[in-house]
Amino acid sequence: MEKRRFLGVCLLVAVLVLRAAVLGRGDDGGGGGRLLDPGKLEMFVDELPDMPRMRGYGVAEGGKLVAGNLTIGMYETMWKFHRDLPATRVFAYGTSKETATVPGPTIEAMQGVPTYVTWTNHLPPRHFLPWDPTLTAAAPGSGVPAVVHLHGGVQHSGSDGHSLAWFTAGFAATGPRFSSPAAYEYPNQQPPGNLWYHDHAMGLTRVNILAGLLGAYRVASPAEEAALNLPSGEAFDRNLVLFDRDFLADGSLFMNRTGNNPSVHPQWQPEYFGAVVVANGKAWPYLRVRRRRYRLRILNASNARFFRLSLSGGLRFVHVASDSVYLARPVPTRAFLLAPSEIADVVVDFVESGNATAIVLRSDAPAPYPGDPGDKAETVPVMKFVIDDDDDALSTEPDTSSVPARLTSPSQYAKPDAREAVLMRRIAMYEYTKEGTDEPTHLYLNARSYMDPVTETPREGTSELWDVINLTDDNHPLHVHLALFVALEQRSLRDVDDLKECMMARGSGGGGADACGLERHLAGGRKHVVPKQERGWKNVFKVRPGTVTRLLVRFRPLSPPDSRRFPFDVAAGPGYVYHCHILDHEDNEMMRPMKIVR
């Protein structure tokens, strides 16, 4: 039934293509010209930038912290990704066109002190990258639609960056869920940790983020962090924002103009992968360091690429937080997997490098991930750390930092307890293909499109168990807005194709799993161990292909543990969403609305 409905919609393609003339399919900067051979770019010639920092709070007389008010715009500007690459046209966040950067400025907020941000759209009438008019997408009469989501933020849905709350330059056009041009309010009443902000416009998220609309956001608690004594200060506590891009020889960003299934989707492809790895806006940069501890807050801001990160010389990462929440105890690893939109907060001690003068951060994850059995991924450099204790330009401040044996107290945050769940939901992940080919046409959650009526209505103050059934060949990083969750277990299905055939024949969502014998398909299936650094509270979790992942999802504040109400009305406004954070999937229906009730 779902396939028939989709094919019926595809009959409208000829009509929908007319929408391309409105927003524009992108000019020559988005797809014409000769693709750059990345081998012609010398690695490690650009220094890793520290993005501009903006204080998300004010300081009143007497040193009292008060709410901060920021105005951050979206601009079309030029950005140098590499010394030998011509400047690239991008969309970027900043306080002006001249100061806008890719990534955007790092917003530094204080726990419990609100940050108000007025987001302004100064983007041009046409997008410079191609987009697909056959997707459910924002398509105004003129201008580039944009809306900002604070990923990991605990905020009212009116400030959450709803995909249909987009707006163009000067608010000339707005989406159906747009309410007012007032500043977004971020209460910052959540644990200290790492967040990021990015575009979230309907059907254009992958394109706008590819163009450069992303940035880091921190929530700090000075008292808590002083007690932890982790590496601190701008020199020793750095954000690393990683993503991949392709370029043309003239420096332009490259995005495909023709899709894998052009008769269905003229431009959309299942995943975007670039051959150039970018860190903080520079291709394969370097960072000069001393032999001491550094804290690295590593965000994977790629559209679809997974990074499996390791350090040359066998250096360790010590994980102190995952996504937006500290772990209970530090977890040492030699390598770890980071999905799109995941954040790993790690400490690296370059004392362990011995006599080495350089350490390379590298990745060996296949693309797409996990790929076919037997695929061997190439190890690619990400950036280089140049160790020089004699460099007078580096801070000589002695290293008094440490990594404590315990990062949070047992009573600080709520403990995961499956017994508190008030109900069980089944969330099934589907990928549909064109008949006669293996090429995807769209991806659904619970066999429903984004525009179908809301089916998930959790109650504030409760927790739920979600069994996420991945019936596809891809690993999908699941993100739930507002909520935090813990992965309790992950089990392989014994016969994915049989279960998928049954469930698709029924045209059902996750609820049809029982009728199709889900437990029988799980019996004897492999149990996957959740990595230690991913056993805490998270807002993104990797759902392996052919598995059922059980999540305990918390629709209430994490701290204090007995909290039941958020500091705002969660039932008001446009509502929240949950989705796959592979942006190409999210833009093609792998996202569902969620309405929280009181």
Swiss-Prot record:
Subcellular location(s) per record: Endoplasmic reticulum membrane
Region (Disordered), start-end ranges: 391-414
First and last residue of the signal peptide: 1-24
Cofactor note: Binds 4 Cu cations per monomer. The Cu cations are bound as 3 distinct Cu centers known as type 1 or blue, type 2 or normal, and type 3 or coupled binuclear.
InterPro entries: Cu-oxidase_C, Cupredoxin, LPR1/LPR2
Gene3D superfamilies xrefs: Cupredoxins - blue copper proteins (2.60.40.420)
Biased composition range(s): Polar residues: 397-412
Biological processes per GO annotation: cellular response to phosphate starvation
Binding site for Cu cation 4: H476, C580, H585, M590
Any one Gene Ontology molecular-function term assigned to this protein's record: oxidoreductase activity
Topology in the lipid bilayer: Peripheral membrane protein
Binding positions for Cu cation 1 per the UniProt entry: H149, H479
Induction pattern: Induced by potassium deficiency.
Coiled coil residues, start to end: none
Tissue occurrence: Expressed in leaf blades.
Keywords, alphabetical: Copper, Endoplasmic reticulum, Glycoprotein, Membrane, Metal-binding, Oxidoreductase, Signal
EC number of the protein: 1.-.-.-
Start and end residues of each Plastocyanin-like domain: 285-355
Top class in the EC scheme: oxidoreductase
Similarity comment text for this entry: Belongs to the multicopper oxidase family.
Role of this protein: Multicopper oxidase that may play a role in the maintenance of inorganic phosphate homeostasis.
Name by which UniProt lists this protein: Multicopper oxidase LPR1 homolog 2
Species the sequence originates in: Oryza sativa subsp. japonica (Rice)
Gene: LPR2
